[in-house]
Amino acid sequence: MSETSKSESLDPEVSEGLCSKTLMQSIVHELKLQMRIGLPLVVMNLLWFGKMTTTSVFLGRQGELNLAGGSLGFSFANVTGFSVLYGISAAMEPICGQAFGAKNFKLLHKTLFMAVLLLLLISVPISFLWLNVHKILTGFGQREDISFIAKKYLLYLLPELPILSFLCPLKAYLSSQGVTLPIMFTTAAATSLHIPINIVLSKARGIEGVAMAVWITDFIVVILLTGYVIVVERMKENKWKQGGWLNQSAQDWLTLIKLSGPCCLTVCLEWWCYEILVLLTGRLPNPVQAVSILIIVFNFDYLLYAVMLSLGTCVATRVSNELGANNPKGAYRAAYTTLIVGIISGCIGALVMIAFRGFWGSLYTHHDQLILNGVKKMMLIMAVIEVVNFPLMVCGEIVRGTAKPSLGMYANLSGFYLLALPLGATLAFKAKQGLQGFLIGLFVGISLCLSILLIFIARIDWEKEAGKAQILTCNTEDEQTSQGSGQDSHS
């Protein structure tokens, strides 16, 4: 046998080994890219949680009535304002991510400008809602004095709406390009000032000052991020010269609005479900104890949510970038790599929650043994929920990265509202399971959400989605034009 024939006989094995090596290298490369995007986001989200905790602490120092009214006002702001603005700004992720992958900086610029205008417009009716919060709360049976404090708190929180109308799009604009370090550093700088701002304003204006500190801190982030975008974009002349800031067509607006509806509902349906759970818990026997346990457990969940949300942003960015670059294999690899990471992270998060269940409750109370025991028990159930919660977040962001947020909306609607809440209420009230029943219902509902999204993702035609991304970013049209002109010249 000749040397040539020997080498040929080894070709299949060598080829298989090379393919395996190449696959591992590509996965490792993908993980490195996602770590670079995700780690700063984890820090940023944890800082945001710290900012909210600081606000709660300073509200508590204003007295029991101010704490109740301010907390109620902030919950109202979350449900009617923040969730809506965050949800609508999420529509930028697939457009900007795919535009960046396709190097269509004009589309990036115009989407940022349109998103800011859209959020400012949406902020107007939300503002009127906040100004009438006193009537709304008393109409639902809330105490007059608490409703009045909530109205005062929201009145001085109003500037947060236009500020978030700039902040949310700026964050989405940068993160969709994989630029997350500036977001982390600007958030860290502003958060470091949040405590001194609170000290000064809470002493001078009381609960009004605590509300003002929230939007002043976010306003600092807006100024810093705006400065960063302007300076860096001007340094990269190619990006700045493409312009597009004021060059919007009706089709551009239609695309953004079509995506913003499902994106907004996806976020709101999830946020509102947790708020409804808290309200329903207030109808259990010993409501003060039950609500306290649930809030303490959810506070630990918020810490894990910082990691969860960062994973989701990573995969949405990577999938949309690869589809925009017309690389369906890269998008597929990014999606499934992050899904595996999400499953592993969910298991780790569950173990961390179990490990801290004895310590976490003691941070809030030392004397109430019923609450301490309740926290230990409920954190075990919540740990099981985290196992499915992490991959659920990843799956939701995968479908968003493919510009199909309606899939996430249908999954959340089915899982949270057709199953989790009805089943939880049945177990809690009729089966006398109490708070445990609500969490079991939540687990079953989230599991359904995950199952639906996994089926959707398994059926994705990545080649087709890459083609759609080229149409979205107008590359297909440009290529057809250039091909047509080329054929004319040949003829």
Curated annotation (Swiss-Prot):
It comes from Arabidopsis thaliana. InterPro entries: MATE_euk, MATE_fam. Keywords: Cell membrane, Membrane, Transmembrane, Transmembrane helix, Transport. Interacts with BCA4 and HT1. This is Protein DETOXIFICATION 56. The chain crosses the membrane at residues 39-59, 72-92, 111-131, 154-174, 181-201, 212-232, 261-281, 291-311, 336-356, 379-399, 409-429, 438-458. Preferentially expressed in guard cells. Coiled coil: none annotated. Could function as a HCO(3)(-) -sensing component in the CO(2) signaling pathway in guard cells. Acts as an upstream repressor of HT1. Plays a role in stomatal response to CO(2). PANTHER family: MULTIDRUG RESISTANCE PROTEIN. The gene is DTX56. Disruption phenotype: Defective in stomatal responses to Co(2). Showed more rapid leaf expansion under high CO(2) condition as compared with the wild type.
